[in-house]
Amino acid sequence: MTAIAKIYAREILDSRGNPTLEAEVTLENAVCGRAAVPSGASTGTKEAVELRDGDKTRYLGKGVRAAVDNVNGVIAAALVGFDGADQTGLDHRLINLDGTENKGRLGANALLGVSLATAHAVAAARKQPLWMYLSTLGESKVSLPVPMMNIINGGAHADNNVDFQEFMVLPVGFASFSEALRAGTEIFHALKSVLKGQGLSTAVGDEGGFAPDLRSNVEALDAILEAIGRAGYIAGEDVLLGLDVASSEFRDNGKYNLVGENKRLTSEQFVDFLDDWVTQYPIISIEDGLAEDDWAGWKQLTERIGHKVQLVGDDLFVTNPKVFQEGITSGIANAILIKLNQIGTLTETLESIAMAHRAQYAAIVSHRSGETEDTSIADIAVATTATQIKTGSLCRSDRVAKYNQLLRIEQALGVGARYAGRDAFVSLKS
């Protein structure tokens, strides 16, 4: 019943107007699963390869026809007849079919599209929502994650003077996901009012957050704190703050170049800088606080504030189990950001999450800046008991689609729905 009868891919557009790949897998019982692949703006050097055509006369070189052809050709030929219910076996066949360390021959976008679409198809064949089916592949428990809401965009995600890429609010002091979402939404609208009152733009960046031309990173934090209060919530109690520093983007010749603060800092000085911020503001999470190749700096940052703040590796680990294991062994960071297209298959994604749980690292399931209406990451976050999810701000349908899916899942779970809330950070001590 779950043998694969047909695999087909097409080129579609993502939220930035760039081409991406969408795959469909049809089983022998005619049930079809579909998945679309996201794309990042700031990327780690060790990420799996996203295959682009490079033809400048078409989509500015960003077409994905080659990846589509790989799905419709060599991948389909290898997988038709394979049992889609054997997700691990299917993904290993995809990996072996590509045959490279970084999935550069067929493209991680080709592999991930097929991997995810197969899971959707099998879930549909079993008349289960995706989150319920995925929970049978690993974790038996499910929970609703804390949303890390990116409400001010900077860095590579916006055209402004803010160095840091994301300023987030984390509504932890609520009993349910739906109440947490409401709080985040009210803060988002309050922030719009704050920015308008300062004569600043309320245009939004790639992930739906505002991208005002603030003079410094500190101004972004101060504006968010004002918005939290104006919305009727208490910063540090109801709502905590998170940062995606994306520091690899502004490290140059061994120095961290903060244009907004007019500073060029060594690794040690930048650790001091972040430590000061944690003291001054209710910050609970810092992502990519140091550059991906600055492991000595990461070690120092972890030893300094890792007991009281979540230190997330994104570019640092690129969802790669081998790289992640090196970080665990070295005592680097205490959380990992999970981006499916960084590694390229569902099985490897689930393996990274399981590895995080075993090492007592937090796992945060994440979108990319170039998204689609696909909501798979919401189901994955719930099914794996990941304590947090990053899926952007409270506008743009490509972001809100994931929040709406989480609302549906919460309703489906009924009295069994459990919101992670403060428990997401129970291992951190002040």
From Swiss-Prot:
Keywords: Cytoplasm, Glycolysis, Lyase, Magnesium, Metal-binding, Secreted. This is Enolase. One of its GO terms (cellular component) is cell surface. Component of the RNA degradosome, a multiprotein complex involved in RNA processing and mRNA degradation. InterPro entries: Enolase, Enolase-like_C_sf, Enolase-like_N, Enolase_C, Enolase_CS, Enolase_N. Catalyzes the reversible conversion of 2-phosphoglycerate (2-PG) into phosphoenolpyruvate (PEP). It is essential for the degradation of carbohydrates via glycolysis. (2R)-2-phosphoglycerate binds at residues 165, 339, 368-369, 390. NCBIfam families: eno. GO terms for biological process: glycolytic process. GO terms for molecular function: magnesium ion binding; phosphopyruvate hydratase activity.
